[in-house]
UniProtKB/Swiss-Prot annotation:
Pathway the protein acts in: Lipid metabolism; phospholipid metabolism
EC number: 2.3.1.274
Stored NCBIfam families: plsX
Catalytic reaction list: a fatty acyl-[ACP] + phosphate = an acyl phosphate + holo-[ACP]
SUPFAM superfamilies linked: Isocitrate/Isopropylmalate dehydrogenase-like (SSF53659)
Localisation: Cytoplasm
Protein source organism: Trichlorobacter lovleyi (strain ATCC BAA-1151 / DSM 17278 / SZ) (Geobacter lovleyi)
Stored HAMAP family: PlsX
GO molecular function terms listed in the Swiss-Prot or TrEMBL record: phosphate:acyl-[acyl carrier protein] acyltransferase activity
Chief location: cytoplasm
Function: Catalyzes the reversible formation of acyl-phosphate (acyl-PO(4)) from acyl-[acyl-carrier-protein] (acyl-ACP). This enzyme utilizes acyl-ACP as fatty acyl donor, but not acyl-CoA.
Protein name per UniProt: Phosphate acyltransferase
Length: 345
């Protein structure tokens, strides 16, 4: 199953995308379609001696820029690399699409081309965070800044299914991000969502606070995209600042430098644990297919890992299982509508 890579997205495209794709093909044996300017992509491939790898090129004559309007770009730039990557998924030529380009356009392209899973109102962008207990999935981290309670409940359903079947967590616990653990805490949105989640068959643990994310108190944390994006950017900034401060302290003291020599292995393992490149990208969950959104400044390692995670996601059966779990909890979502359970599709 091939993975389509938007090779023209990102701050350093197409060099980084091609380097990451070549690494993924070499290391994991994943067949890849590079989508973008054919001449430029062939030139980049020549730099990596990739003639023996299962990498093909699908020409795209347009590129969606970082400052383009997401919806307009997807509709007007029909031959853009990000849209064509999702078209390849729709046509069955690829199992997943990966892009480090305009995240809004990537989300819009996924929704416009692949559509949403039946019953899902809003797809969500999910991000894996390292924790003291392993890893925690947080969603939404930027796709939907204004949400209703039904959206957050659907995020919880999607998060539990993804954590179980794509991340391999047997019975993931779900927490709703709030400003306290008591049911009386939160705002109108979280209190309404909390009440609905308690009626579902999900493994719901109640409210969690920001500090619980890195403790690993639960394996899935649900929030709206505004809060989630703040959490994500704060975490990235904190990790970067911590590393810089630590390096400054070590380099400013001779004894600290000597101690570092003995602890170098531990520092390298820690750096690997908190390095976003190890997690590749953030899956767009809730569309009828697989899309992976990468940081615009991703390096080749991040692209390589995003391709691997996208391929694993595509083979996990998550999309079908989300529809089934949604049907199972439809009564809690819409208790007074009298509507029948939507068909699993």
């Amino acid at each position: 199953m091939r993975v389509a890579v938007d090779a023209m997205g990102g701050d350093n495209a197409p060099a980084i995308e091609v380097e990451g794709a070549v690494a993924a093909s070499r290391q994991y044996g994943i067949p890849i379609i590079l989508v973008g300017d054919e001449d430029r992509l062939r030139q980049e491939l020549d730099h990596h001696a990739a003639s023996g790898l299962d990498i093909t090129i699908h020409h795209a004559s347009e590129v969606v820029g970082m400052h383009d309007s997401a919806s307009d770009a997807v509709r007007k730039k029909r031959n853009s690399s990000v849209r064509l990557a999702f078209e390849l998924v729709k046509d069955g030529q690829a199992c997943a699409a990966v892009s480090a380009g305009n995240s809004g356009a990537t989300m819009a392209a996924g929704m416009f081309v692949l559509k949403r899973i039946s019953g899902i109102e809003r797809p969500a962008i999910a991000q894996v965070f390292p924790t003291l207990e392993g890893k925690t999935l947080v969603l939404d981290v930027g796709g939907n800044v204004d949400c209703k309670a039904s959206h957050l409940v659907q995020f919880a359903i999607m998060g539990q299914v993804y954590a179980k079947h794509a991340l391999g967590i047997p019975n993931p616990r779900i927490g709703l991000l709030s400003n306290g653990e008591e049911d009386s805490k939160g705002n109108e949105l979280t209190r309404e969502t909390n009440a609905i989640l308690r009626q579902t068959s999900l493994n719901y643990a109640g409210y969690v606070e920001g500090r619980d994310i890195f403790k690993g108190t639960v394996e899935v944390v649900v929030c709206d995209g505004f809060v989630g994006n703040v959490v994500l950017k704060l975490s990235e900034g904190l990790a970067e600042a911590t590393g810089t401060m630590l390096k400054r302290e070590i380099m400013g003291d001779m004894i600290a430098k000597m101690g570092y020599l003995f602890m170098r292995g531990a520092f390298k393992r820690f750096k690997k644990t908190v390095d976003y490149a190890e997690y590749g990208g953030a899956p767009l969950i809730g569309i009828n297919g697989v899309g992976m959104i990468c940081h615009g400044g991703s390096n080749a390692k991040a692209i390589k890992n995003a391709i691997r995670f996208a391929h694993d996601y595509a083979t996990s059966g998550v999309t079908q299982r989300i529809a089934e779990k949604l049907s199972e909890n439809y009564g809690a979502l819409f208790p007074r509508t009298g509507q029948s359970v939507p068909p699993v599709s």
